[in-house]
A protein has these predicted regions:
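Helical catalytic core of nucleic-acid polymerases
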Residues: 103-104, 130-151, 303-425
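A short, conserved structural fragment
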Residues: 158-177, 452-454
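Acidic, glycine-rich two-metal-ion catalytic cores of nucleic acid-processing enzymes
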Residues: 179-361, 458-460
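Short amphipathic alpha-helical interface segments
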Residues: 33, 51-55, 74-147
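Short amphipathic alpha-helical interaction segments
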Residues: 146-164
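Catalytic palm active-site di-aspartate
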Residues: 326-327, 366, 453-465
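Polymerase palm active-site segment centered on the conserved acidic dipeptide of motif C
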Residues: 467-492
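C-terminal accessory/binding modules appended to enzymatic or scaffolding proteins
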Residues: 425-450
């Protein structure tokens, strides 16, 4: 067999490289010189069609736990599934019948895709869904957050439904843009066949679909601002304990209660954005730099959480106007309760010298001092919080142009709240948020036992105005029980 001649020119080296041939007859210096001489092709941006770009801008993640909940929705899903199977048989895609486990997985996949596509189309006709197609991602070990049927056959099901006209795919790709190499996820939207099928059910609404019991409602995750970018926002798998089982049972009770609640908007009110009144299943999310069930735990994912304040004020519960109640100076009061000290009278963000300064600045600084972990990370530190909180930096010049500086503000807060000074800069804020979420859940369950629907918005509870006094009393009782301090409850 003739011996290959070693490349001696940049053109020869480029030819060898294009054919995957390794250069074995050059010294390292000669090899490097030839590589430098060969011009490197510049990556060209991938020109995505305008409709694909728009689809990605409007996309939300696919929700695999959405299910049909009414006879109408179940009938629609069954019709679509039968048509997909018929299309598969007509094309002769499969030579053998699926095994029972594979058949169940295929049916669950089609059901979830149809349910979420229909739900998205009814709630926001211009919206789309992002879906995974990467084999490595779909082949990863399943945890408590994953749908059992999402596996390596998922892209094949997407393609089959796309071929049958029930969905349109805008496939993801690597893209060279302003910030270098970036990837875009695949997005899908309802196809013409699905739109035509939906047209046969004029009474179909988003309320015909809901999240099934398979979705985890007790979520443990890394914080979104974690120092390690690989961990930011990632969910953490965990083993169940009596505590997690109890919390999940509480969320099931509340979610079932909200699912049957009479929630609506005031007649004549035009919301800023479409409101999906069927989005009522909430989860408790425990998110922190070092995630545990003692940090965080607020409730998320319902439609009233993401509503603008103006739209939320137009909510009706049982056709009744509502009022929002929240705790005043909650974290500072919890700090006094933990220290076993009496809580000062009045607004804790306006004690002494603090009353002369803008409350909207003092409040986030005081809470940030409780969140700050400087004395945990450096036990020898005498202070912490070296920068203004990010949420007030932009408005600091407008609202307080003559401020004395962060160091002075910190010192005055420490002086005015001397009994709890030892708790600043020790990262207790997320612990207090966990206590606060415990109080909120306890109040919601107590309201339910009275037949009253309460809707949580972080540290606030929305109730019918006629039940304001009862809700306020319950909030005071539960706060005293959990935080060991007296609460201040007021209208938000």
């Amino acid at each position: 067999m003739p011996r290959r001649r070693a490349p001696t020119t940049p053109e020869d080296l480029a030819l060898w490289r294009d054919h995957g041939i390794r250069v074995r007859h050059l010294s390292p210096a000669e090899h490097a010189a030839l590589h430098r001489a060969v011009p490197k092709p510049k990556p060209k941006p991938l020109a995505a069609p305008l409709e694909t770009v728009n689809a990605r801008l409007k996309a939300r993640p696919f929700e695999p736990h959405r299910e049909p909940m009414t006879p109408t929705a179940c009938d629609l899903v069954a019709v679509v599934f039968a048509l997909v199977e018929e299309h598969e048989q007509r094309l002769g895609v499969r030579c053998r019948k699926r095994r029972p486990a594979d058949a169940a997985s295929f049916k669950a996949t089609v059901t979830a895709l149809v349910s979420d596509l229909v739900h998205q189309l009814l709630s926001d006709p211009d919206g789309t869904l992002t879906v995974p197609r990467r084999k490595g991602q779909l082949g990863e070990r399943k945890n408590r957050y994953d749908a059992w049927f999402l596996g390596e056959t998922f892209p094949r099901t997407l393609d089959q439904m796309g071929d049958a006209g029930f969905l349109i795919q805008h496939k993801g790709a690597w893209h060279y843009g302003t910030f270098g190499r970036q990837s875009f996820k695949t997005v899908i939207e309802a196809g013409p066949a699905l739109v035509a099928t939906i047209g046969q059910y004029p009474d179909l609404t988003t309320a015909d679909f809901a999240l099934g019991e398979g979705r985890e409602t007790i979520v443990l995750k890394w914080s979104n601002n974690h120092p390690d970018a690989r961990l930011r926002g990632r969910k953490v798998d965990y083993d169940d304990t009596p505590e997690t089982i109890r919390m999940r049972g509480e969320m099931t009770t509340l979610n079932d209660w909200w699912a049957g609640a009479d929630l609506s908007l005031s007649p004549g009110h035009s919301p800023e954005a479409p409101v999906n009144l069927s989005r009522r299943t909430m989860s408790r999310i425990f998110s922190a730099a070092d995630p545990t069930f003692g940090l965080g735990g607020r409730l998320y994912h319902s439609f009233w959480i993401i509503m603008p304040t103006e739209d939320r004020a137009a909510l009706l519960i049982g056709r009744e106007p509502v009022v929002s109640l929240d705790f005043g100076s909650a974290f500072l009061r919890m700090a006094y309760g933990r220290a076993g000290e009496p809580v000062p009278a009045g607004d804790l963000y306006a004690v002494g010298k603090l009353a002369e300064w803008p409350r909207d600045i003092v409040k986030p600084v005081a809470n940030a001092m409780l969140d700050d972990r400087t004395k945990i990370d450096d036990p020898g530190a005498v202070s912490g919080l070296r920068r203004w909180p990010s949420d007030i930096q932009a408005r600091l010049k407008e609202e307080w142009p003559a401020h004395p500086g962060l160091a002075v503000v910190r010192a005055v807060i420490e002086r005015e709240h001397a009994p709890i000074r030892s708790m600043f800069y020790r990262g207790v804020g997320m612990e207090f948020q966990a206590l606060e979420s415990r109080i909120i859940v306890a109040v919601l369950l107590a309201l339910r036992s009275m037949g009253v629907v309460g809707l949580p918005v972080h540290d606030c509870i929305i109730v019918p105005k006629k039940h304001e006094a009862a809700a306020k009393e319950l909030m005071m009782i539960e706060f005293r029980k959990v935080a060991k301090a007296e609460a201040e409850v007021r209208r938000a």
